[in-house]
């Protein structure tokens, strides 16, 4: 597929997701990075978003709960270019009923070439980057060219 570019603004749109066993870890990371996160637009799956907002006071746009379709809602926002960064603390040692949704969310993040952090270390590296505070060009699939070729 042909590629095009998309500009991520200096104030990123960041999705926050965590499996049940990882919610405490994500809360700790968010609390430690609250000052940085306040400069961005935050989204989350339902249960995670409500918990983070309640505990930190951050403004977070919450989807519905992940197992009820929240992962899919975030995936749709990614494919529409409305999410720039995905922070997803998932539990690799515990299967969840909505594993196909989890895989789909990670796949769509890769398709649309957005940065993904899956644990505290990768989130720390990602948020330590000066690119988090800058306008950034990323390559994405050129879906419009794809549609034009199909007709």
From Swiss-Prot:
Keywords: Lyase. HAMAP family: Methylglyoxal_synth. The keyword Lyase applies. This is Methylglyoxal synthase. GO terms for cellular component: cytosol. The keyword Transit peptide does not apply. Disulfide bonds: none annotated. Its EC number is 4.2.3.3. Residues 1-151 form the MGS-like domain. It comes from the Bacteria. It catalyses: dihydroxyacetone phosphate = methylglyoxal + phosphate. The gene is mgsA. CDD domains: MGS (cd01422). Belongs to the methylglyoxal synthase family. InterPro entries: Methylgl_synth, Methylglyoxal_synth_AS, MGS-like_dom, MGS-like_dom_sf. GO terms for molecular function: methylglyoxal synthase activity. Substrate binds at residues 19, 23, 45-48, 65-66, 98.
């Amino acid at each position: 597929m042909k590629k095009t570019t998309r500009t991520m603004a200096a104030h990123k749109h960041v999705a926050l997701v965590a499996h049940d066993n990882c919610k405490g870890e994500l809360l700790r990371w968010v609390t430690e990075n609250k000052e940085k996160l306040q400069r961005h637009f935050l989204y989350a799956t339902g249960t995670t978003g409500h918990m983070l907002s309640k505990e930190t006071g951050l403004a977070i746009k919450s989807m519905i709960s992940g197992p009820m379709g929240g992962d899919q809602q975030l995936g749709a926002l990614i494919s529409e270019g409305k999410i720039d960064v995905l922070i997803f603390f998932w539990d690799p040692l515990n299967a969840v009923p909505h594993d196909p949704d989890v895989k789909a969310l990670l796949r769509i993040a890769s398709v649309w070439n957005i940065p993904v952090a899956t644990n505290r270390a990768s989130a720390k590296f990602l948020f330590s980057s000066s690119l988090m505070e800058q306008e950034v060009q990323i390559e994405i699939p050129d879906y419009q060219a794809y549609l034009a070729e199909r007709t």
